[in-house]
């Protein structure tokens, strides 16, 4: 199958939901060819787990419901638990968002599902799985997609057994691997070597769901599809770049898992570094998967390993005046080891040592139990030279808000309306909910799973890209693991440690605190 376009064409007249998906189906290899192509079997490894229940099955249902999958697609769940399809359906129902009018379609979806129980390290279990797949329509000719919704501790056994017992005989086989892709550079390289000994790179889909988000995918179009940004997207005009990921909740019972990884491994080394590479990379020769990923690797190679002096680490503590979970600090979570020094907040400053970005700080900020839910890219531009307005002008900023409420807006100066002759801050605003009211933005997993069906790897992580990401962070992570520095406490629901604000101010980010956003829908 060919590569699909990453976005549906938008006409001047808003499209209905059915029209949107009709347009998308046309882009999937001219609709008919894609939908009536070979039989596909999608196998969910770890079908009894939370990821499968909350994300994978719902995503497959939405794609099936909207007619975006090939017509002859079947689904097989595999896990150690003794389950039935009815049991899986019952556990998934709260997350499927199925309406009463979709009941018949939902029944058809689950009629395409089957389930096999087995052990991940047991060859006989996978031989049995293969026998079951061969009984489905398409038999040995069906294409197979394996989604590893599993802990990384079983990747080795599962992938080896897939290779030896479950590869499609006459169709293609693709394997989707969830993060974490290792714990540091060495473990990541070992995993990559293991996978490459079993599969070719075009069979491996390392999924970072952030690469499926609307505004992350929009970064390339915004940069390379608009003439106005090219001349200013460099060190001559950009003072600094801030990449932010904030969550308003803590670990809430997931402390055991989180404590093994921490916020840097969980968010910064993958999600935020992916954003950085899309902001900083050079223009690719085309939008082909390898051309795009080649440029991302090139820019990552220009970043030196992070040093501790460019990092602030924090850990949230309870707010005595808060409500519910806000009263509890990280160490109050019963699943967290006593006295843990794991970071729930981090700010780091990176520099891209190339002609375009030399000297421009890239500030990565992420944390849990903060004052809001927000993920965004913010380019702050340099001051206007030769100021004639008596220091009343603030720096321009271009902001790409990834979540919530996708938007692109530019902070700029304009004359204050009325008899005044002085500048004030305002914005050029493209809020998606206002501009594209009738467009259903697909979930990140919908986009990415559809990409796997189509064979597009643009929004998946390649092995050399992964290697460079770990090279940048591993020395810092090893130092933190060895020295266990005490993280700076910050109150649940706050902005994070004040020391982080001091760091970003020191490297050149300017926070004026004077800007007031006005919702255009409430004027």
Predicted regions and their residues:
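Secretory/organelle targeting and membrane-embedding segments
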Residues: 2-177, 181-523
């Amino acid at each position: 199958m060919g590569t699909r376009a990453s976005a549906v064409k938008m006409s001047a007249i808003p499209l209905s939901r059915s029209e949107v998906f009709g347009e998308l189906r046309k882009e999937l290899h001219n609709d008919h060819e894609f939908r009536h192509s070979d039989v596909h079997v999608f196998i969910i490894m770890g079908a009894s787990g939370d990821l499968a229940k909350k994300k994978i099955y719902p995503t497959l249902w939405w794609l099936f419901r909207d007619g975006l999958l090939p017509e002859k697609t079947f689904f097989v769940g595999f896990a150690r638990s003794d389950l039935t399809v009815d049991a899986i359906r019952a556990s998934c129902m709260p997350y499927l968002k199925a309406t009463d009018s979709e009941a018949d379609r939902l029944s058809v979806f689950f009629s395409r599902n089957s389930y096999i129980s087995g052990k991940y390290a047991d060859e006989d279990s996978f031989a049995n799985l293969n026998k079951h797949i061969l009984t489905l329509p398409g038999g040995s000719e069906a294409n197979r997609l394996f989604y590893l919704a599993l802990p990384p501790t079983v990747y080795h056994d599962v992938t080896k057994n897939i290779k030896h017992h479950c590869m499609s005989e006459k169709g293609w086989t693709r394997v989707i691997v969830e993060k974490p892709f290792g714990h540091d550079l060495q473990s990541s390289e070992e995993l990559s070597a293991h996978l490459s000994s079993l599969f070719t790179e075009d069979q491996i889909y390392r999924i970072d769901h952030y690469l499926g988000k609307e505004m992350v995918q929009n970064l390339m179009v915004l940069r390379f599809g608009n003439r106005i940004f090219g001349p200013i997207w460099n060190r001559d005009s950009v003072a600094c770049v801030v990449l932010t990921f904030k969550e308003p909740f803590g670990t809430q019972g997931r402390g055991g898992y989180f404590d093994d990884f921490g916020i840097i491994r969980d968010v910064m080394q993958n999600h935020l570094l992916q954003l950085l590479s899309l902001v900083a990379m050079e223009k690719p020769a085309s939008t082909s998967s390898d051309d795009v990923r080649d440029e991302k690797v090139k820019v990552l190679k220009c970043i030196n390993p992070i040093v501790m002096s460019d990092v602030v680490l924090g850990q949230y503590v309870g707010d005595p005046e808060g409500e519910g979970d806000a009263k509890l600090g990280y160490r109050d979570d019963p699943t967290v080891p006593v006295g843990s020094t794991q970071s729930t907040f981090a700010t780091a400053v990176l520099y891209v040592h190339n002609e375009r970005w030399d000297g421009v700080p890239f500030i990565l900020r992420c944390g849990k139990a903060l004052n809001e839910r927000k993920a965004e890219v913010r380019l702050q531009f340099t001051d206007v030279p030769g100021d004639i307005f008596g220091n009343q002008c603030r720096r321009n900023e271009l902001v790409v808000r990834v979540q919530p409420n996708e938007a692109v807006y530019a902070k700029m100066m304009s004359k204050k309306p009325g008899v005044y002759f002085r500048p004030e801050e305002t914005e050029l605003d493209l809020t998606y909910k206002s501009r594209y009211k009738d467009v259903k933005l697909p979930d990140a997993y919908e986009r990415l799973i559809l990409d796997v069906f189509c064979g597009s790897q643009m929004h998946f992580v390649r092995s050399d890209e992964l290697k460079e990401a770990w090279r940048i962070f591993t020395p810092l992570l090893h130092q933190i693991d060895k020295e266990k520095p005490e993280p700076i406490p910050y109150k649940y629901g706050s902005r994070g440690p004040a020391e982080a604000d001091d760091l970003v101010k020191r490297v050149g980010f300017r926070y004026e605190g004077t800007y007031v956003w006005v919702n255009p829908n409430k004027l």
